[in-house]
């Protein structure tokens, strides 16, 4: 449990954590940070050191209260009017799960939405919505964001790890264990030398170099 304790402390202190799912799934390592602590410099680190897609994961309960749907469900609805879409919709990914993608958003005060400061603003504002979801979060969401945007929202499975073992659920479980606002930024770590995902061994080297906790999915499942 030491690795989990270190990861929880890092998240509470506004630092990064690395999460490896498993060799039997994506076999990828994601860079993870609590949305409430995100700053523009953190976005820069994620896009340069990790290099994958910067996404914001939120729990299924909050997504439901915001009337957010999974992207494949939205596309299914749209395909009634655009039949060609039905052939493109991916309900099951190659690694065996339904994708957790929902819509993309920008905060209304952003310009293009893609800059480090714009993305950090969008993420922090969405974290604020999640923190007051039972007060005026739903109203704030519709007033303060526009879509499409540059932050990809991910919706966690309703039963979290009982239902799905992706980085979305793993990071949400860890953020819940840390008693932080239930919104977490995740980004896949890529390898520019191999053009593939960064191996666990290389992620471990990075972890030690920058003193960032690296945890396995099995450790999170045992919380």
Predicted regions and their residues:
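Catalytic domains of riboflavin
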Residues: 1-223
């Amino acid at each position: 449990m030491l690795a989990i304790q270190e990861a929880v402390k890092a998240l509470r202190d506004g630092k990064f954590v690395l999460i490896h799912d498993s060799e039997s799934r994506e076999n990828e390592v994601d860079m993870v940070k609590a949305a409430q602590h995100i700053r523009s410099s953190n976005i820069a680190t994620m896009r340069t050191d990790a290099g994958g897609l910067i996404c914001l994961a939120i729990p299924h309960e909050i997504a439901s209260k915001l009337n957010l749907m999974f992207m494949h469900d939205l596309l299914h609805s749209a395909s009634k009017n655009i039949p060609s879409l039905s052939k493109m919709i991916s309900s099951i990914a190659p690694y065996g799960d339904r994708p957790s993608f929902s819509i993309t958003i920008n905060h209304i005060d952003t310009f293009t939405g893609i800059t480090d400061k714009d993305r950090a603003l969008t993420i922090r504002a969405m974290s604020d919505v999640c923190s007051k979801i039972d007060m005026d979060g739903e109203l704030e969401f519709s007033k303060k964001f526009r879509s499409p945007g540059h932050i990809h929202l991910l919706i966690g499975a309703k039963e979290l790890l009982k239902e799905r073992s992706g980085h979305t659920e793993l990071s949400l479980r860890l953020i819940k264990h840390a008693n932080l606002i239930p919104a977490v930024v995740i980004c896949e770590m890529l390898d520019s030398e191999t053009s593939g995902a960064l191996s666990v061994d290389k992620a471990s080297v990075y972890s030690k170099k920058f003193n960032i906790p690296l945890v396995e999915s099995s450790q999170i499942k045992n919380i």
